[in-house]
From Swiss-Prot:
Keywords, in A-Z order: Cytoplasm, Golgi apparatus, Membrane, Metal-binding, Phosphoprotein, Transport, Zinc
Biological process, per Gene Ontology: negative regulation of hippo signaling
UniProt gene name: MOB4
Cited Pfam families: Mob1_phocein
Function: Part of the striatin-interacting phosphatase and kinase (STRIPAK) complexes. STRIPAK complexes have critical roles in protein (de)phosphorylation and are regulators of multiple signaling pathways including Hippo, MAPK, nuclear receptor and cytoskeleton remodeling. Different types of STRIPAK complexes are involved in a variety of biological processes such as cell growth, differentiation, apoptosis, metabolism and immune regulation.
Record: residues binding Zn(2+) 1: 92, 97, 169, 174
PTM notes: Phosphorylated on serine residues.
Name by which UniProt lists this protein: MOB-like protein phocein
Membrane topology classification: Peripheral membrane protein
One Gene Ontology cellular component: FAR/SIN/STRIPAK complex
InterPro entries noted in UniProt: MOB_kinase_act_fam, MOB_kinase_act_sf
Quaternary structure annotation from Swiss-Prot or TrEMBL: Binds STRN4. Interacts with DNM1 and EPS15. Interacts with nucleoside diphosphate kinase. Interacts with CTTNBP2. Interacts with CTTNBP2NL. Part of the core of STRIPAK complexes composed of PP2A catalytic and scaffolding subunits, the striatins (PP2A regulatory subunits), the striatin-associated proteins MOB4, STRIP1 and STRIP2, PDCD10 and members of the STE20 kinases, such as STK24 and STK26.
Species name: Homo sapiens (Human)
Amino acid sequence: MVMAEGTAVLRRNRPGTKAQDFYNWPDESFDEMDSTLAVQQYIQQNIRADCSNIDKILEPPEGQDEGVWKYEHLRQFCLELNGLAVKLQSECHPDTCTQMTATEQWIFLCAAHKTPKECPAIDYTRHTLDGAACLLNSNKYFPSRVSIKESSVAKLGSVCRRIYRIFSHAYFHHRQIFDEYENETFLCHRFTKFVMKYNLMSKDNLIVPILEEEVQNSVSGESEA
């Protein structure tokens, strides 16, 4: 999209825009972004530029409030996990995946009910993403996207633990769908590095061997060199 000199760039996909023309505007530096949604825009811009460059995506701009940075990343993870949930619907059915499980040792109870109970995996996935969206859009806990109270930031860890179960179920029970989506988005890889960087989950709960595979591939590459 070439704009005349001095003309403001409309950073929005107009109705009727073709898929190949989505986001067809020049990148901005973070300092040039003057919207209250600047952090979200910056994260999404880096993902579009190269979703495999996880270190770049997770590196905050200088002086960025850490609570807001974690919050905006978690919102983005939930947005992208909806894409995985849509793909899972093709084979993750209530009569075949009757429980939200990962390995045989893990059965997860759904917190969307008054008393947590077992749900079919696809229902658990929907309930969990809906619950995360409700919390992250709550005016009570997150009235501002510019500054966030520490007591609200503390709630992000529980959201991380719950949405991670979507990755783990997909990995252990729908591996082809998981691999295809991961190869497109690097989403589980990015999420794993994110929660480790900010200590939002215990390493013992990170049961999808994403980083182990990375280390093995690195060692294999060095051996072949």
